[in-house]
């Protein structure tokens, strides 16, 4: 198994506590509401949201994938840290065993947030995972992130 790592930082005008709440704690209800063209629904299959929880994210038609299952490994509200893996779904294909994701929400100097994201693509055997394939996954996530961020900025009580 090979591991391809992609690291990035995303800035947001939303303060860290609110950003963590929006993008992690309220994900299950907020994302299907704000981006129904991308995320159709989120089902908690097992657990209470903390470590060990398994969620099924169902995507809207036209997204290119039907669903993924996430397994939560760490949910640290005090330090605004979230770690999960995609353990099932057609995004994994025959090349990927899993995708693991670490997200840390840190204060930015302007009062907003710097989200540090480390994504690890765990390949099956010697399978190659090309940079273009990584970019597609990251760009799709970035579009959804931006749409939700815009909604929260326009609706601060969300």
Locations of regions flagged by a protein language model:
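Structural signal for hydrophobic/aromatic residues that build the beta-strand cores
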Residues: 19, 23, 55-57, 72, ...
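Beta-strand/loop substructures that line and gate deep hydrophobic ligand-binding cavities in soluble
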Residues: 83-140
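Hydrophobic/aromatic beta-strand elements that line small-molecule binding cavities or substrate pockets
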Residues: 8-10, 68-74, 98-107
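Hydrophobic ligand-binding cavity/cleft-lining segments
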Residues: 1-50
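Intrinsic-disorder/low-complexity, polar/charged segments enriched in Ser/Thr/Lys/Arg/Asp/Glu/Gln
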Residues: 3-9, 39, 54, 67, ...
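Glycine-rich portal/gate segments that line the openings of hydrophobic small-molecule binding cavities
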Residues: 27-30, 40-94, 155
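C-terminal helix/juxtamembrane-tail motif
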Residues: 1-2, 106, 132-158
């Amino acid at each position: 198994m090979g591991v391809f790592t992609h690291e990035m930082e995303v800035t947001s005008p939303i303060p860290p506590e609110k950003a963590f709440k929006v993008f992690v704690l309220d994900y299950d209800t907020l994302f299907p509401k704000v981006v129904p063209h991308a995320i159709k629904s989120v089902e908690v299959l097992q657990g209470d949201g903390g470590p060990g929880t398994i969620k099924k994210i169902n995507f809207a038609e036209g997204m290119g994938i039907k669903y993924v299952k996430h397994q939560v490994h760490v949910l640290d509200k005090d330090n605004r840290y979230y770690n999960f893996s995609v353990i099932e779904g057609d995004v994994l294909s025959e090349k990927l065993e899993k995708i693991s994701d670490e997200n840390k929400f840190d204060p930015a100097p302007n009062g907003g947030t710097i989200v540090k994201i480390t994504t690890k693509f765990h390949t099956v055997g010697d399978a190659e995972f090309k940079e273009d394939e990584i970019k597609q996954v990251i760009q799709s996530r970035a579009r959804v992130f931006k749409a939700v961020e815009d909604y929260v900025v326009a609706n601060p009580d969300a």
